[in-house]
Amino acid sequence: MEVNSKPGILKRIAGPVVTAVDLDAHMYDVVKVGNEELMGEVIKIDGADTVIQVYESTTGIRPGEPVINTGLSLAVELGPGLLTSIYDGIQRPLEVLIQKMGNFIARGVTAPGLDHEKKWTFKPVVHVGDNVVPGQIVGEVQETRSIVHKIMVPPLAKGGKVTKINAGDFTVDEIVIELDSGESFPMMQKWPVRVPRPYVEKHSPSIPLLTGQRILDGLFPIAKGGTAAIPGPFGSGKTVTQQQLAKWSDAEIVVYIGCGERGNEMTEVLTEFPELQDPKTGNSLMERTILIANTSNMPVAAREASVYTGITLAEYFRDMGYDVALMADSTSRWAEAMREICSRLEEMPGEEGYPAYLSSRLSEFYERAGLVEPLAGGSGSVSVIGAVSPAGGDFSEPVTQNTLRIVKVFWALDANLSRRRHFPAINWLQSYSLYMAQLNDYYDEKVSPDWNKLRSWFMEVLQKEAELQEIVQLVGSDALPETEQITIEVARMMRELFLQQNGFDPVDTYCDLPKQLDMFKMIRTYADLAYAAQAAGVPPSQILAVKAKNEMPQVKFTKDYKPVLDKIYAGMEAEFKALRA
């Protein structure tokens, strides 16, 4: 729909930012730039000059070419067909573009976000005469084997009594419900990406988003509807950690945004996810996943769009009552895109050249996470996990600092740990979770009343080891008092048995809470027996030589680990009894 018959004229081109004159447009209108009709968005209006950020390469366009205003905001199509898709930053389906153009996609090519030809089986859940309100669920579509797509009345509709509702096979454009207010709706709706979708109320999160990663679930958990940041230098494992979370977190829907990172990483996700099984349903992980690929060689302006597109898709599934996990890899690349556009606009730079509005844009994004009561009732959540790539691993740079002010969970990746081949390379002394107090009741009721005590003891031992490490490096562990020699050994077991996890091992890649509790207790049992033996006068050299502890790593890599655990407990009891005899 083109509302402005008179096109504007291109006056100035500076990389992804172009200026047009005599264009009748509003802020954030989508425009078509040049003879090739490249997609752009109005970001500044100064008198007769309209400044536009272009979502495709501007190479080859020149002043004098026309600019056409569509009169629409940048919006995404929401409806059946989103899951299993791979989009670019402005919701163009890459698979459809490949069919149109081949592997090298020309500029100006576009395609709708959803397949408008495919028919979906619509099952109504309301009847003629029922009163419906905005956001209410009126029907269902079995989109994949795992996920039922719930069709909702658009949030800005008036609502009213149902006068007609159809059942059967329809495309996303065909009308499925009519109301006495004169409104009628298809299965698809559109929503502008920069506007958060409405809800009734936001709640305080109280259930953990379980990830199957021991260091995260055990020591630094994130809640469903929470926010987390994963900052770390190059090669410390940000992307692998994000991929592990996308694979194994117990969210029902996963939105994975590759924002300005390497193309190979998106390829890995595309090749691995279809082969992996969802531990809850047994179906392919791809069936609950939406991928947004905006790699580092794509135009910078589209990075910002990709983040907003991703969070809008996540909010849509949240409104159906699903728990959604959104991975943004990496928010630093988005901030760099903002910095580049800020400098093209000749705005006053803030710290390190980033725009002065960096923190407000980051807040805008992270604040769209949360556990909410949707308009349809019930509850739904969006958990946001953003990777941050500080140059040289410097956590004092603006993107990391502004992110830490907003998020409540900090998983600090450490290059020293990754160089020692300790993965996931999350530093247990720097990381924190501010959700612990809210989640304590869940762990007490659903896992064990001992969980929180064991976790506190675990952290105390790791802190103690860090304090002793300086002495050990200077004079060796033999110079320490006997109890502290045992503490060093227990901390080593914690690091190697519990905190280290092999993402490429079919068993160790995912560890549920009951198994984590058993591993906590196994290490605690050894520690209690060791301290008791030392108090009874057994020398540390004999305590540290107990053979049963050499069997402990088998627990990590064995699916049916209970017999192994029983054997370890029996071995420890017998050996410590013999030492004290």
From Swiss-Prot:
Chief localisation class: membrane
Keywords: ATP synthesis, ATP-binding, Cell membrane, Hydrogen ion transport, Ion transport, Membrane, Nucleotide-binding, Translocase, Transport
A molecular function (GO) term: proton-transporting ATP synthase activity, rotational mechanism
Lineage of the organism: Archaea, Methanobacteriati, Methanobacteriota, Stenosarchaea group, Methanomicrobia
Subunit record text: Has multiple subunits with at least A(3), B(3), C, D, E, F, H, I and proteolipid K(x).
Family: Belongs to the ATPase alpha/beta chains family.
Name of this chain's protein: A-type ATP synthase subunit A
Gene3D superfamilies reported for this sequence: 2.40.30.20, 2.40.50.100, Bovine Mitochondrial F1-atpase, Atp Synthase Beta Chain, Chain D, domain 3, P-loop containing nucleotide triphosphate hydrolases
PANTHER family: H(+)-TRANSPORTING TWO-SECTOR ATPASE (PTHR43607:SF1), V-TYPE PROTON ATPASE CATALYTIC SUBUNIT A (PTHR43607)
Topology relative to the membrane: Peripheral membrane protein
Record InterPro entries: ATP-synt_VA_C (IPR055190), ATP-synth_a_Xtn (IPR031686), ATP_synth_asu-like_sf (IPR023366), ATPase_a/bsu_AS (IPR020003), ATPase_F1/V1/A1_a/bsu_N (IPR004100), ATPase_F1/V1/A1_a/bsu_N_sf (IPR036121), ATPase_F1/V1/A1_a/bsu_nucl-bd (IPR000194), ATPase_F1/V1_b/a_C (IPR024034)
Its biological purpose: Component of the A-type ATP synthase that produces ATP from ADP in the presence of a proton gradient across the membrane. The A chain is the catalytic subunit.
Catalytic activity: ATP + H2O + 4 H(+)(in) = ADP + phosphate + 5 H(+)(out)
